[in-house]
Amino acid sequence: MTADSASINLTHHFLIAMPGLEDATFAKSVVYVCEHSERGALGLVINKPGELSMQSLFEKVDLPLHRQDLINAPVLQGGPVHTERGFVLHDAMWADVPEQETPAKTEPSDGEPVASGEASHEAVEVVQEDAIEAAQEAEALSAVSHKESAKESVYASTMTIPGGLEMTTSKDVLEALSIGAGPKRVLISLGYSAWGEGQLESELAENSWLTVGADTAVIFDTPVEQRYERAMKLLGLEPWMLSNDVGHS
């Protein structure tokens, strides 16, 4: 990796697939980058709906859903890694703790990982640990992010992302949504996207992706089918303006 590529940090950015990127998973995709460092990157595709609605997902994990604003929302295909497991992107939910104490987070009884229902909860490993294993490929996901100053997330297994967002992998966030509480803005995906050391930088050098700082309105307030064009517009672009060729001439 060059010094220039090592200095790139695309955390809280969008990766926007160039028109010529024909990969089945990432063609015309917008990826929200949750974590990026010299060790790799992790993100969620935010514009590829899967077959499940949120209501269907909640039924599969034996929870009601009393959030009318979420019932018909699609569960997204976040990427090709661990597609049976849920990743919840949402506005940050803080819990105040005494400033003099910085306790390490322990796994409470409601720290069960989010799963799609295709495997029993007992058979599914804690997703946070799985993400760390995947970090051997991407080395991108911190075990549990320690929050700045005297604040930490109210949920058991959460990564804090600059820009006021969190990604939670424990079932407690679904339990909060189930009773009509929880974060106001929510995106749920099955699976995530990961890049190993230098891999994303190589793809950027090949002109596979455009990058732009993330706008949370695109994630949460824009219809799924419009997110690709809306992300492009953050750069002042339309898809027709770009060449279908990927790579250097």
How does the language model describe each region?
Residues M1-I188, S193-S249:
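A short aromatic-anchored loop/beta-hairpin motif
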